[in-house]
Amino acid sequence: MAELTPIIVIPARMQATRLPGKPLADIHGEPMIIHVWRRSVQAGLGPVVVACSEAEVFDAVHAHGGQAVMTDPDHPSGSDRVWEAVRKLDPEGRFDAIVNVQGDLPTLDPQIIRAVFAPLAEPGVDVATLVTEITNEEERTNPNVVKAVVGLRPGQRVGRALYFSRATVPANAGPHYHHIGLYAYRRDSLERFVSLPQGVLESREKLEQLRALENGMRIDCALVDTVPLGVDTPADLERARALLKA
């Protein structure tokens, strides 16, 4: 099978509820979105583009030498924004894999981006994502920590996702896995995904990835050792600034 040709797309929007203007939040003299863009470039997978809906984000990315594309401000999800950006940038289909990197991960290790792409080497995989083993008891029962049900044997680093939930699953003794919301898609799989109606379980759990499972799509999970810091609040922003302090 021919090797995939990926593009990295970073969806960014200014209307975050808990941290308005998040993409342009200053971290040591640069907007947060630039930190994410730079780390995505360092992953070395392919071109990197920011998918935004505000001119100020577009201008900031271009001012730092990056590429951005304007998208519809009313998309219901980041996946829809990513797909619009891909269609605009690459209508002829040169890129057959898309890596979706969240725009609020300024401390993201480029190796994590490479890790999420790797499972697509298996021909039957539609979507790839990441998990890490939960070691904190509070996280195990926290509904804001999404759990992935994946049967990883000892020493195994990639496994097939059977379900995602906010509940503590599976039952009984054994590891639980924290789902990390980075994704890599085959192009035709992303196109299909955004065309599907919202699923029953997706609506119930408020987890978009369940739409893929409800429609028979295969999601494989790569096991990584750390959870990247997502910046959702002013306190998170201060943590990111501290971590990135020169």
Curated annotation (Swiss-Prot):
GO terms (BP aspect): CMP-keto-3-deoxy-D-manno-octulosonic acid biosynthetic process; lipopolysaccharide biosynthetic process
Keywords: Cytoplasm, Lipopolysaccharide biosynthesis, Nucleotidyltransferase, Transferase
Matches recorded under Pfam families: CTP_transf_3
Keyword Cytoplasm appears in the UniProt entry: yes
EC top class, as a word: transferase
Cross-referenced InterPro entries: Cytidylyl_trans, KdsB, Nucleotide-diphossugar_trans
Main location, first listed in the record: cytoplasm
GO molecular function, one term: 3-deoxy-manno-octulosonate cytidylyltransferase activity
Nucleotidyltransferase found in the keyword field: yes
Pathway: Nucleotide-sugar biosynthesis; CMP-3-deoxy-D-manno-octulosonate biosynthesis; CMP-3-deoxy-D-manno-octulosonate from 3-deoxy-D-manno-octulosonate and CTP: step 1/1; Bacterial outer membrane biogenesis; lipopolysaccharide biosynthesis
Subcellular location: Cytoplasm
EC nos: 2.7.7.38
Gene3D superfamilies found in the cross-reference section: Spore Coat Polysaccharide Biosynthesis Protein SpsA, Chain A
Catalytic reaction equation(s): 3-deoxy-alpha-D-manno-oct-2-ulosonate + CTP = CMP-3-deoxy-beta-D-manno-octulosonate + diphosphate
An example Gene Ontology CC term for this record: cytosol
Function statement: Activates KDO (a required 8-carbon sugar) for incorporation into bacterial lipopolysaccharide in Gram-negative bacteria.
Record family assignment: Belongs to the KdsB family.
PANTHER family, sorted: 3-DEOXY-MANNO-OCTULOSONATE CYTIDYLYLTRANSFERASE, 3-DEOXY-MANNO-OCTULOSONATE CYTIDYLYLTRANSFERASE, MITOCHONDRIAL
NCBIfam families in the record: kdsB (TIGR00466), PRK05450.1-1 (NF003948), PRK05450.1-5 (NF003952)
Name of the protein in its database record: 3-deoxy-manno-octulosonate cytidylyltransferase
